[in-house]
Design a protein with these regions (language model features):
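The feature captures the beta-strand-to-loop junction immediately N-terminal to the Walker
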Residues: 57-59
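Conserved ABC ATPase signature
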Residues: 161-165, 169
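Conserved beta-strand-loop-alpha-helix hinge in the C-terminal portion
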Residues: 239-264
């Protein structure tokens, strides 16, 4: 009983702090796996406001997945690693409040099939799994499952077995299970890698409509990311080498980061179209502003 009263007390404190401090702050985060000499993350410092979409990009082995694992609590709770530094959410030290934080986040990692419960007979049951465990009323569960399935384009698959789905549908199912309980933080590591172009476009259209939830997303879909991200973080060899709004980051890429410029930016460079501050446009909104100025 004492354990649950402590948990509830910490949860109430955290929710109250949300109104006072709406930031997520990472301070001097360094992560090293056992048996490795070099850290996978080195002195990461960043700050975002709640409700923002944060795009995490970088080449292979830059530390993107490791950062996701830390943010999700996979490191060190499931995967062993040495961590220095810390991060705070809504003014609370996350490492001191793991049970509370885990109840407030949703996670989609690179192996979405491995995240499914394996206990559900249907897609609907899989989406409902966490809500059932929370003791939600059956009618409310059905309503919420249908809402999330509609958002993820799975409404026609609700009565199918999860293992019968395609790779892209499995990814959408994993996202559905991650968002069904309305998490405060959503962490997604390459969530569209197996989706077809239509599925990917629908996913990013959905992401553009997400409000209040803070989203961390690793993706190589640069064009789509520029349309939805409030902030972009660039990792290179375990270090945060750039962070800022998409237009700021992509107009100052270093060659050794090996990150392609967005298609719109490449077009604008060929046409020599600039925004008023001299930057090249990187998304549709920027491009419309530039074309209006040139007409």
């Amino acid at each position: 009983a004492a354990h649950w009263s402590d948990w509830i007390g910490n949860f109430i404190d955290w929710v109250e702090d949300m109104d006072e401090d709406k930031r997520i702050v990472i301070e001097n985060l360094t992560t090293r796996y056992p048996g490795t000499e070099q850290p996978q993350l080195r002195q990461i410092n960043a700050e975002v406001h709640t409700g923002q979409v944060v795009g995490i990009i970088g080449n292979s082995h830059s530390g993107k997945s490791t950062l996701c694992h830390v943010l999700a609590g996979v490191i060190p709770k499931i995967v062993s690693a040495e961590i220095e530094g810390d991060w705070h959410m809504f003014g609370q030290r996350v490492s001191d409040n793991w049970p509370v934080y885990n109840a407030m986040n949703g996670v989609v990692l690179q192996n979405p099939a491995g995240q499914l419960s394996g206990l559900a007979d249907t897609v609907a049951d899989e989406i409902a799994f966490d809500l059932i465990n929370q003791g939600m009323a059956e009618g409310l569960i059905q309503k919420r499952v249908e809402e999330v399935a509609t958002q993820m384009g799975l409404i026609e698959q609700l009565n199918l077995r999860p293992e019968s789905l395609s790779g892209g549908q499995i990814q959408r199912l994993a996202i559905a299970t991650a968002i069904v309980a309305n998490p405060a933080v959503l962490i997604m590591d390459d969530p569209t890698s197996e989706m077809d172009p239509l599925g990917r476009r629908q996913f990013f259209q959905w992401l553009a409509q997400v409000k209040e939830t803070t989203v961390f997303i690793v993706t190589s879909e640069i064009d789509d990311l520029c349309e939805v991200a409030d902030v972009v973080w660039v990792l290179h060899e375990g270090q945060m080498v750039a962070q800022g709004r998409p237009g700021e980051v992509f107009n100052h890429l270093a060659a050794d980061w090996q990150i392609p410029a967005p298609t719109i930016q490449q077009l604008a460079q060929k046409m020599d179209w600039h925004l008023a501050d001299g930057r090249y446009p990187v998304n549709d909104a920027d491009l419309k502003e530039v074309r209006y100025a040139h007409n």
